[in-house]
Design a protein with these regions (language model features):
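Intrinsically disordered, low-complexity linker and terminal regions at domain boundaries
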Residues: 13-17
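Soluble acyl-CoA-dependent acyltransferase catalytic core bearing the H(X)4D motif
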Residues: 1-10, 29-396, 400-431, 435-446
Length: 446
């Protein structure tokens, strides 16, 4: 990848969402076992310098159109001739002295989420936290959402960050997939168009209907952020999934667990509990006709989670009925095609984006990105925790992001602390919600 490449419509819409109070980046936070000598800042810079050619986008910055147009749709990616690894991989300033505490790490991450990436440079940065209380270290990888979505960022982490094993390094690269014949692409588009015409009206009615209850996370978003972390075992989620049966999925369990945590948090604050409509991103990678595997390729579906239901298994089965119906009818695929088509006309794309982000459409966003299936290490030290955080949206003061690593699920919470106070208590309530499900399914002690 070299020269100039126009910022595509979907990524331009994401970039345009950034305002004085809403950032456009995501964060990945890795907490790593101790290394002799502490965090390897110099070695990480050296590793990235050697590997960045694998991900050319990370050496590119945004440049205006030669025509002088200022809109995001007129921007181009171009190689950064002044790229400096030291400007992108830097020591984090988290403590006045001594090791960084967990609270200080969370405060630093919150400040990063509230900040902005320098648009004159490639839109990513890594802050290295050189010493934690237990001797370990951490890094906070900030990357703008207009560069990549969650699935793509995990591929980039494999390419850029994790240790490579001899088998990985010696294995021949998989051949690039051959593009389908032109007539096959045309035929696929006609078939999609026919399916779209048939399914769109019903899908739009199901997905784009107003939320009746007032959102507990609504309100005017400010400039500060608070973050919190929770975690659980994949085997715990799988136990609940298998015990529930009837096609319940791990993601159904996650949504029910988050719903149960929100219920606890609201009840403790004497807030009303109603139905929370959750916006669930759905990856469309490998489903596009050209086999695209880069950038942003996300759709979504809305799932009603009955917070008023006190029985955790009934709540889980209600969530499953919602997700199963939407998947069976192909709602995420239909919505992706609709908004992809609208996005080709920038004005319509902006209207569509505002519609799907309206506080009248959903309560909060809960994502689940599959991370590495095997344990990972950096410079020989185990990566023991891996969290993801995504930005909140106008009048949506809470966002929940889950990411797996080997046998664990890590959940990140990003919030406006004025509207969502004590987000750390919400994280604890989500862990308690899973414990409740384990108790009723005989899974204690897993």
């Amino acid at each position: 990848m070299s020269g100039r490449e126009r910022l595509d419509e979907e990524d331009a819409r994401i970039l345009a969402l950034e305002t004085a109070t809403i950032a456009g980046h995501t964060c990945k936070i890795a907490i790593v076992d101790p290394l002799p000598g502490g965090a390897p800042l110099a070695a990480l810079r050296e590793r990235l310098t050697a590997r960045l050619p694998r991900v050319p986008r990370c050496c590119q910055c945004l440049a205006p159109s030669p025509s002088g147009a200022k809109k995001e749709t007129a921007l181009f990616w171009r190689d950064d001739d002044e790229f400096s690894i030291d400007a992108h991989v830097r020591p984090a300033r988290t403590s006045a002295g001594g090791p960084t505490t967990r609270a200080e790490l969370l405060d630093h991450v919150a400040a990063v989420m509230a900040g902005r990436l320098d648009r004159s440079r490639p839109l990513w940065a890594i802050d290295v936290v050189e010493e934690l209380e237990d001797g370990g270290w951490a890094f906070v990888w900030t990357i703008h959402h207009c560069m990549c979505d969650g699935m793509t960022s995990m591929r980039w982490a494999t390419e850029l960050l994790w240790d490579e094993h001899p088998a990985d390094a010696s294995a021949p690269a998989a051949p690039a997939p051959k593009p389908p014949p032109a007539n096959a692409v045309v035929e696929a588009r006609w078939l999609r168009a026919a399916a779209l015409a048939e399914h769109t009206p019903a899908a739009m009615v199901r997905e784009l209907r107003p939320v009746e209850a007032r959102s507990p996370f609504g309100g005017k978003i400010g400039t500060t952020r608070a973050v919190a972390f929770a975690h659980c075992g994949i085997d715990e989620l799988r136990h609940v999934e298998k015990t529930a049966g009837d096609g319940v999925t791990l993601n159904d369990v996650l949504l029910a667990v988050v719903g149960g945590g929100i219920r606890r948090w609201l009840v403790d604050r004497h807030e009303g509990v109603h139905t929370a409509r959750v916006k669930v991103p759905v990856s469309m990678h490998a489903r596009t006709p050209d086999g695209d595997t880069s950038g942003n390729r996300d759709s979504f579906m809305f799932v009603d989670v009955p917070l008023a239901e006190p029985d955790p298994m009934r709540r889980l089965r209600a969530v499953h009925r919602e997700t199963a119906a939407r998947k069976r009818r192909g709602d995420p695929q239909t919505l992706y095609s609709v908004f992809e088509a609208l996005g080709r006309v920038p004005a319509l794309g902006r209207v569509a984006t505002r519609l799907t982000m309206s506080p009248h459409e959903f309560t909060l966003n809960v994502s689940n990105v599959p991370g590495p299936k095997e344990p990972q290490s950096m410079f020989g030290a185990r990566v023991r925790e891996l969290y993801s955080l995504a930005e909140i949206a106008p009048r949506h003061a809470l966002r929940v992001s889950a990411m797996s690593l080997a046998s664990s699920m890590f959940i990140g919470f990003n919030a406006d602390p004025v509207i969502v106070p004590a987000v750390d208590e919400l994280a604890a309530d989500v862990e308690a919600s899973l414990a409740e499900l384990l108790a009723v399914t005989g899974g204690e002690g897993l």
